[in-house]
Structure formats: structure tokens, C-alpha cells
């Protein structure tokens, strides 16, 4: 089955499938939950929509158990806001904070969250330090999610970069006057270890669920760190792929999950 046909079947939109081959990278949109979702044609934006919004719950790229029932969510690496609006649909009573340092992504993120009052977005990255840092751009001009804080993440040196603002994650939490983060989604192209290990442990002790993608930078050190804080870990990794998804849940939440849910992790 061709990629275009898969996109058509899931989206029920001929225009969405056709946009896979629209190399002009125009801003287009698709209806989801009776709201418009904006994206750049023929880019990784469309992959995000397909893998997160258009898949059944247990096959979506990220899995967030309803049993978590979060009040506060951090979407770290917000990209164009696809995960944020997915989280808003799952947890309409939660307050969602989305952080995206790339201005080009952020402009589309703002358009996508305009219909969701429980999402607040920030055009910054999170990390252990405050400052402006280089973010290297993918050599694949259609991949707007393949940025990296590291110039040589895969053995193919990245030449192009932009400078983006990064804020210390603990400073941001204090500024927002938060005393807990119930759920964290993180996909920061290799900065996951730096971000989560710099987060004050008192917050992670109160966090019920962390879900994200890891990129080959101290990944298993991070998972071991989370395990030491009381998280149980599940991961889905292919032996020849440095990228993989993971879920980390506190035992109190996992004990509430059904057998079907646990098998899907």
C-alpha cells in the first residue's frame, strides 16, 4: 500500500494525501476533531499528523494513559503543536505548556493551538542553562523535526544552524508558579538527558508519566536515572536504529492500567 493511499485512508482527505507531493511546502490544513490543523506540505509535519492524530489510540506515536489524569503537562519540543492538541483532546481539564525553540515551527504551533484555551506556548527551548544556543538543521530540507543541538548526531555533519533561546527548566517552573508537573512529553533531538536530569528531583518525584523519543545521546543513562526515581520503563527499539520511543510510569499509575494497555506499551 502506497504512503499516499495510507494517508488518504486515515485522513479521509484527498487533499491531505495529495499534499505529500506538493514540494512547494505551502501552508495547508486538515480538519481534525472539527478544528483545523495546519502543516507544511510534503514535510515531516504531515508525518506527525499521521502518526499522532490519525492513528488509533494504541497505535499513536505517543501513549498517555487516561489514568494519569494530569492537571499540569509539559510538552517539551512542541514542534508545530500536534502533540499538544492531541493531549488537549485527551485531557481537556489539564493545563498544557508547550515549548518550541524554532521560530518557523512556533509560528505554525500558534496557529494550531488557537482553538485550545488550555494550551500555552513558549518560543524557547528548555535546558540546564540560560542562553542562546545553536540548533543544527537537518540536511533533509523536508524534515523540520530533525534538528539537533549537536553538529554531528548521526555521522553526517550538519552545517546549517539557527540560534535559539534556551531557558533553565527550573527557572521556567518557578516563573509559572508550579509545584508539580504530572505528565511530561519530551522530544528534543538529543537534549532529553540534559533537560530531565537538570529538572529538580522534587518535580520528578511528583511526575506520574514521561513519554518521549530518544536520539542516541546518553539514552540509557537517562532511563536508568528515571528508574532510580521510581519509574518503570518500557521502550521500543530496533537494533539498527538509534531513535526509539520510551514510556516511564510510576508504579502507582501502572497498577491501575489494564492488561491490554500494558501490552500496548
Where are these regions (language model features)?
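Phosphate/nucleotide-binding beta-alpha loop and adjacent structural elements of enzyme active sites
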Residues: 1-265
Amino acid at each position: 500500500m502506497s504512503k499516499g493511499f495510507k494517508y488518504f485512508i486515515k485522513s479521509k482527505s484527498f487533499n491531505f494525501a495529495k499534499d505529500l507531493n506538493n514540494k512547494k511546502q505551502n501552508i495547508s490544513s486538515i480538519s481534525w476533531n472539527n478544528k483545523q490543523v495546519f502543516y507544511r506540505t510534503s514535510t515531516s509535519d504531515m508525518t506527525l499528523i499521521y502518526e499522532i492524530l490519525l492513528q488509533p489510540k494504541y497505535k499513536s506515536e505517543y501513549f498517555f494513559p487516561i489514568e494519569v489524569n494530569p492537571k499540569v503537562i509539559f510538552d517539551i519540543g512542541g514542534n508545530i503543536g500536534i502533540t499538544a492538541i492531541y493531549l488537549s483532546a485527551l485531557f481537556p481539564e489539564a493545563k498544557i505548556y508547550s515549548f518550541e525553540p524554532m521560530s518557523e515551527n512556533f509560528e505554525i504551533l500558534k496557529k494550531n493551538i488557537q482553538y485550545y484555551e488550555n494550551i500555552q506556548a513558549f518560543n524557547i527551548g528548555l535546558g540546564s542553562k540560560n542562553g542562546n544556543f545553536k540548533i543544527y538543521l537537518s540536511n533533509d530540507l523536508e524534515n523540520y523535526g530533525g534538528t539537533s543541538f549537536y553538529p554531528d548526531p548521526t555521522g553526517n555533519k550538519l552545517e546549517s544552524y539557527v540560534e535559539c533561546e534556551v531557558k533553565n527548566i527550573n527557572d521556567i517552573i518557578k516563573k509559572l508558579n508550579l509545584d508539580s508537573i504530572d505528565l511530561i512529553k519530551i522530544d528534543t533531538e538529543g537534549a532529553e538527558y540534559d533537560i530531565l536530569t537538570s529538572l529538580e528531583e522534587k518535580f520528578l518525584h511528583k511526575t506520574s508519566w514521561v513519554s518521549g523519543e530518544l536520539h542516541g545521546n546518553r539514552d540509557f543513562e537517562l532511563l536508568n536515572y528515571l528508574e532510580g526515581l521510581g519509574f518503570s520503563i518500557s521502550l521500543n527499539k530496533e537494533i539498527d536504529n538509534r531513535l526509539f520511543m520510551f514510556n516511564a510510569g510510576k508504579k502507582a499509575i501502572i497498577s491501575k492500567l489494564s492488561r491490554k494497555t500494558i501490552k500496548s506499551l
